[in-house]
Amino acid sequence: MSASGKKPGTKGTKRHRKITSCRECHRLKLKCDRVWPCENCKKRGIPNLCPNGILVSVSDKLIKLLLSRIDTLQNCVKSVSPNHESLIVSSDDQKIIDDIYEKFGEKPAEDTKDENRSQPIHDPDHPTLEDVAQMLGKLKVGSHGYFNYYGASSSRSCIPQQDPNSEEEDTFMQRPFLYPASSYNSALHWSHRIPNILNPSTLCDMLPVPQFAVRLMGLYFDNVGWSSHIIHRPSFEEACLNLYSAAPDRTNPQPQFLSLTYMVFCLGTLFTSPVLVRNRYSLAHEFFLRAQLCFDISVSGFTPSLDSVVAVMLMAQYSYFCDRLERTNFAWNCIGLAIRLAVAMGLHRDGEVFELSAFQLHMRRLIWSELLFFDRMLSMSLGRPFAISNDQTNVHEPSNVCDIQISSQSNCIPDPSYERTEASFTIFKAKLSKVIASVLDRAFRFTPPSYSEVEALTEQFKVLENELPDYMRISRDTPNLPPMVIIEQYSAKFLIQQALLYLHRPWFVRAATRKEEREHYKSSFNLCTSVSHELIHNLYSLMCLVPVEPLRWWVFRFHSLNAGIIQAAYALCFPNTDYALTAYNDLQYICRIFEHLKGGFMFSNKDYDFLIQLKSKVFNRFQLSSQGLTPEDLTEDVPFLHFNVPSSRPNSKSPDDSSMRAEKAAQLDGLGLSSDDLNTAQSENLPIYEQENPLLFDSLSWHVPKDDTRNDKSPLVPTWNADMMFEEEQKPIVPIDLSSMQDDQVSSLTTNEEFDPLSSFQASHSGSNFWTNMMNEMGIPK
């Protein structure tokens, strides 16, 4: 036996050793103190596992869970049973999906022996329910009439992710840069006088007295509301009077509605009597500044709502009565902002798909129709592309219902009336706006369109005019109607005539300036001449029937100005024809009308000066023609409307040869100006429409010294009388086709006992002999 105690030649047996560490310390290779629970397990917070337990890590749990779900998913895929548990949606949602599939899903065709039975085929031209849902987008409706619209193509990162239970509204913008001097400076106007001016309650206390407020609201709806029906009068009057409530529980007014209220007061003040208001222009601008301040209070001023859109539209209308705002393109910026606000609240989508109330649906359609019309008329006047095309909106036309027939408690929109309502004029403008959009789209193309497109658009205008209801047509009973109805009837006629002039004006220029193309475009030449003549005399008839103040609508200015320019262009090109004297009388006529219309307003002063200069140039042309000079000798001296004139060249640039430059230099020298002062003279002295369209007018070549004999301080009278402005021999000559009239009518006209421009013009256009003779004088064959 050895010293170790083992027998020699035998293996030693292992003895049972004591536990040296717990299982967790052994797994982590930590030194264990062998006191249960050990110190390491106590520090790790697992004393209950010591000494025999082991901790499974979180990562191991996730991996095992993932593996188990993968196995379950593989089994479900291999299984043919559709009743397996879904891993993506819950069981309740799966039941809803199955129900929808049973109702709307495409089912396999049933077996039938009838071979003639056709199978349902999916038509790509007819979108499915899923396609329509993808196009609509989503509309969020909040408290106080706030809306937010997000299209289906919008990025989720652009949509504010807020608590759905929160009452906080989404905002659209932070600061309105409407014109260079931003409107937030309007707060400084009262900061030194009124403390806490940025509080809506303070601005509410600054409202005029209730009696004056009621008077201003009446003046607005009588003189401005007819031009754009964007305010529901009963609801607005009720809400406006609630601002004067002295109830202790009265809530703070919304800044958007305060801005709208102040703009109604602003436009109503422009039509007040001088006896009631000493300086109405100053007071109107004060209301305008308060409206801007309400609009800019905090970020709530740009929360998309109907009140904010209407307030901005009224600001654009007011800018045409303020010379300072008109120079800064304020209306253009306002309408652009209003369209963005309207699109942000989904006005370009018909509200019926969003299940809105009848009142909200009706007002949204009215406001959107008026906004589109305003934008497109502004595009015509400034020569800029419009904002929204017809293909980007699906809003239906408003219903022809009275304001008193619908309210916020109405369950449905009443049946449309067959008589005239407050919405009738808006419905007509909505129909006309669609055709005007096609005209503008053609006008702003970079490639010259075909003349067949112009003829097709002309037919659309004729169809629209023929489909006018009886209450929108000028008739013999028109003088007996209320003033607002008379203005609407004449305005419908004016709008169609102006759109026709805008459409055919480029072709009129080509027919007048190019002899080789005169035969091809004689229809446009004839149309522009006759329509402009009719428009001027219709404006005269309207001024004889209604007060002057409502006629200061900015659209009338553009209508009559364009017609006067076309008549002047004819007289400059063909001074030896019989119609040239009539064209000159029309130009003189429109100058006197503008002198009478401008009154105390500044918006027509520049147009009046421009027409006076043009009339002087036509008069000089007549003097040169009387001395034996032929029109061909003076063709290069005649400026024309080259804007949007189709050209065979790809870049349609106006000619600028050495003779024209020398002529301009001579004219500038006669005015006491140098060529370096050209840009300054154009920017300071030209009207806004000439600054925006340098190719549309050539005012420097038309510039003549002002006529000092004219009286700029013409009295303001309720209605207009031609005897106040013309002598008997100065009244305009109306071309009349005597061959198409009876003997008694001819005798009454030759005696010149009474002049009725409406009836005389209708008589002059009863036949085509007059215009045929005029074309023969110009050398145009039949």
From Swiss-Prot:
It holds the Pfam family Fungal_trans. GO terms for biological process: DNA-templated transcription; regulation of transcription by RNA polymerase II. Residues 105-126, 645-665 are annotated as: Disordered. The keyword Transcription regulation applies. GO terms for cellular component: cytosol; nucleus. Residues 654-665 have a biased composition (Basic and acidic residues). Its main location: nucleus. It is found in: Nucleus. InterPro entries: Sec_Metabolite_Reg, Transcription_factor_dom_fun, Zn2-C6_fun-type_DNA-bd_sf, Zn2Cys6_DnaBD. This is Uncharacterized transcriptional regulatory protein C1F7.11c. It comes from Schizosaccharomyces pombe (strain 972 / ATCC 24843) (Fission yeast). The lineage of its organism: Eukaryota, Fungi, Dikarya, Ascomycota, Taphrinomycotina.
